[in-house]
């Protein structure tokens, strides 16, 4: 680790300073974190933030990443994990798409529908749609007209009538208000997504990491994740 070679006491009591590297989903950061960052930097002006947007696996020690904020279920990890909250998801489609293929009211109606295929760097085939029906999660791997691996193109594909998508509600209030997207299958909720903070070790947390971890945990205690 590239920490300054000093006694443990001096290290733990050093003033928070230097570059703090955070790996986080870009839309999530823009919506929830970016508007509040001035507060953090005003309190700790000697910290410089470096935000990296990615959904790939990160070797935090090898790559010098201080903290990772992940959305979704986590694979087994040796990292320290702190749960920040859960994000509500919704199923959406464009009005023109629904006009052409019909509005699904029951899960059985999905047999005549398409989904926008979304795949991540860790999964090279589209992720099925998920619905909760009678307290049980049901998966629907619908046919696709288009497959994407970015959040912005995923939403754009739905707005251009390529199929159903499942996304966090917080990033789509405007499209819903403007009628560019419509919520469907409201009787069958989508499982929520956990939001987690990950870092390498409790014993080797730098002062700048410590204050950011405390700040981000408090931020999400005070701020609902679904607004």
Over which residues does each language-model region extend?
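Short, well-ordered beta-strand segments
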Residues: 21-23, 68, 116, 165, ...
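Central regulatory/effector-binding core of bacterial HTH transcription factors
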Residues: 17-80
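Alpha-helical "hinge/linker" immediately C-terminal to small N-terminal DNA-binding modules
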Residues: 1-13
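A late-sequence structural motif
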Residues: 184-226
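Short loop or secondary-structure boundary microenvironments that flank
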Residues: 26, 144, 199-202
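Hydrophobic packing within well-folded, soluble alpha/beta domains
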Residues: 40, 49-51, 157, 181, ...
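C-terminal regulatory
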Residues: 59-64, 74-192, 221-227
């Amino acid at each position: 680790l590239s920490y300054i070679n000093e006694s443990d006491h001096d290290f733990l009591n050093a003033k928070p300073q230097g570059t703090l590297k955070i790996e986080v989903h870009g839309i999530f950061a823009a919506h929830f974190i970016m508007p509040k960052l001035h507060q953090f930097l005003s309190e700790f002006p000697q910290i410089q933030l470096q935000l990296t947007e990615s959904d790939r696996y990160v070797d935090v020690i090898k790559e010098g990443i201080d903290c990772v904020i992940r959305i979704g279920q986590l694979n087994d990890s040796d990292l320290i994990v702190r749960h920040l909250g859960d994000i509500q998801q919704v199923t959406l489609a464009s009005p023109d798409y629904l006009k052409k293929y019909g509005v699904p009211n029951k899960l059985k109606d999905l047999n005549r529908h398409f989904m926008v295929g979304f795949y991540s760097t860790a999964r090279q085939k589209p992720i099925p749609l998920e619905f909760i029906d009678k307290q049980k999660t049901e998966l629907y791997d619908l046919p696709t007209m288009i497959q994407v691996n970015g959040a912005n193109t995923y939403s754009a594909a739905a707005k251009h009538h390529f199929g159903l998508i499942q996304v966090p509600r917080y990033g789509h209030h405007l499209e819903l208000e403007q009628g560019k997207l419509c919520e469907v299958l409201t009787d069958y909720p989508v499982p929520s997504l956990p939001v987690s903070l990950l870092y390498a070790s409790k014993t080797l947390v730098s002062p700048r990491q410590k204050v950011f971890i405390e700040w981000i945990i408090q931020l999400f205690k005070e701020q609902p994740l679904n607004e």
